């Protein structure tokens, strides 16, 4: 049996040797996270720009750990991958990324369209002296906050995380099952006084996984644990639109989906980033060290930074592109729909009073209260999360191990399959992730 397996693997390797990778671009992205018509259009655009043909092999994943295991352990030769912020940090630490050269000949450098705010945040992502801005380009971003139903919860009360502790909402609270997001958001909130006084700052605080800080967050979670109706990965949006839950700690992308769905049935749902502070998250394009078509990968990332493509991706996914500038601002402005807010941090100093969606582009004063997540002591945070939920901590370890091995098995099966795994999105604002765990 072992001999048969070895022969099969050898055959796959020989097949790989004969593959002309200069005409193939392997892209590995989150499911439902791109306007897939852009994939075909890129192939045409790339030939126009370079005179060379390329065919995209597009595959999707639902969990960061699956993607990472294929690259780190399976040495998969994906050319472009879209990991989350803390995974980019981990890949930098583990020497899994190639530097991103920005020479495109006569083709403009569209990467310069990334909003300065995003570039500043990526400056906070480092691994052994390597800066994320030299090895990655941000793609989408968002925040962590509260989806709430104003029929039951007042706007003023939803402006504080303490709304979760109100015993009147017992059984009506949902918690996103994402330990890193929740921990960092609450850590920032619980240290508001120290941040305001200068004893702590939003850059270094999210790295803090000391026993004291973990206990602080754990005790806070336990203070309203009895009110939590469920720890949701994806069902929270539906529970909110059915009024089975009144408040949900979640991501801004899920919030926008729920708000849109609720509006279609005449329901009012809203999103709040509490005054005590929260966190922002990012996903970005990288070129793994085992990539084979680096040139096409660079051009693909550049292509995704064109303003018109950024708007199309937002329309398709419902998430927020990192691309700023007047073209995107004009597309996203709606004076009849939204009150004016200060989005100068994203669109430039002239955008200090613009009518954009506050769920997608929070006011400057709100964003300045948000830190960002980092790749910090996953094991300790998992144990805390398991204690709060009442899970068996070893079960999480087992799940992670299974994900790694499942990823390797899948890698062998699909490594040389050239079928395009392109999932058709059925609605404009369908969320791209049924599960977005940050392990």
Placement of each model-derived feature along the sequence:
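Early extracytoplasmic/lumenal segment of secretory-pathway proteins
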Residues: 19-94, 393-397
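Ligand-binding "clamshell"
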Residues: 91-100, 130-133, 258-273, 336-340
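Ligand-binding pocket segment of bilobal, Venus flytrap-like solute-binding proteins
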Residues: 175, 182-186, 194-270
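Periplasmic-binding protein-like
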Residues: 108-110, 215-222, 265-289
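Mature extracytoplasmic/periplasmic domains
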Residues: 288-364
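C-terminal motif of bacterial Sec signal peptides marking the signal peptidase cleavage site
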Residues: 15-16
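Hinge/lid segment of periplasmic solute-binding proteins
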Residues: 59, 65-68, 85, 89-141, ...
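Conserved C-terminal helix/tail region of periplasmic/extracytoplasmic solute-binding proteins
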Residues: 352-439
């Amino acid at each position: 049996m072992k001999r048969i397996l070895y022969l099969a693997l050898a055959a796959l390797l020989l097949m790989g040797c004969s593959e002309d990778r200069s005409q193939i671009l392997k892209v590995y992205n989150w499911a439902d996270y791109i306007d897939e018509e852009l994939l075909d259009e890129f192939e045409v655009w790339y030939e126009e720009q370079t005179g060379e043909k390329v065919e995209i092999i597009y595959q999707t994943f639902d969990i960061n750990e699956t993607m990472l295991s294929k690259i780190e352990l399976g040495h998969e030769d994906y050319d472009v991958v879209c990991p989350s912020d803390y995974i980019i940090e981990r890949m930098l630490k583990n020497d899994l990324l190639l530097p991103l050269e920005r020479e495109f000949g006569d083709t403009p450098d569209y990467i310069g369209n990334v909003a300065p705010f995003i570039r500043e945040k990526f400056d906070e992502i480092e691994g052994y002296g390597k800066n994320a801005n030299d090895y990655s380009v941000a793609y989408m971003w968002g925040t962590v906050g509260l989806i709430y139903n104003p029929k039951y919860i007042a706007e003023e009360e939803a402006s504080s995380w303490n709304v979760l502790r109100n015993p009147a909402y017992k059984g009506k609270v949902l918690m996103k099952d994402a330990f890193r997001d929740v921990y960092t958001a609450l850590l920032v909130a619980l240290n508001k006084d120290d941040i305001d006084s200068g004893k702590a700052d939003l850059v270094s605080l999210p790295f803090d996984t000391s026993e004291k800080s973990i206990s602080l967050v754990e005790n806070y979670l336990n203070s309203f644990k009895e009110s939590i109706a469920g720890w949701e990965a994806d069902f929270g949006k539906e529970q909110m639109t059915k009024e089975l839950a009144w408040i949900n700690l979640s991501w801004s992308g899920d919030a926008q989906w729920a708000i849109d769905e609720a509006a279609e049935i005449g329901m009012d749902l809203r999103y709040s980033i509490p005054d005590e502070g929260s966190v922002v998250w990012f996903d970005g394009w990288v070129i793994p060290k085992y990539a084979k078509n680096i040139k096409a990968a660079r051009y693909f990332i550049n292509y995704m930074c064109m303003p018109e493509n950024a708007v199309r991706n937002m329309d398709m996914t419902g998430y927020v592109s990192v691309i700023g500038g007047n073209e995107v601002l004009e597309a996203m402005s709606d004076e009849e729909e939204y009150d004016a807010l200060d989005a100068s941090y994203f669109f430039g100093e002239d955008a200090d009073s613009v009518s954009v969606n506050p769920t997608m582009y929070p006011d400057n004063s709100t964003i300045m209260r948000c830190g960002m997540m980092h790749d910090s002591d996953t094991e300790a945070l998992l144990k805390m999360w398991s204690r709060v939920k009442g899970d068996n901590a070893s079960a999480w370890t087992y799940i992670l191990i299974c994900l790694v091995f499942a990823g390797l098995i899948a890698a062998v099966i699909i490594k040389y399959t050239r079928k395009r795994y392109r999932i058709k999105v059925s609605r404009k604002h369908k969320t791209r992730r049924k599960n977005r765990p940050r392990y």
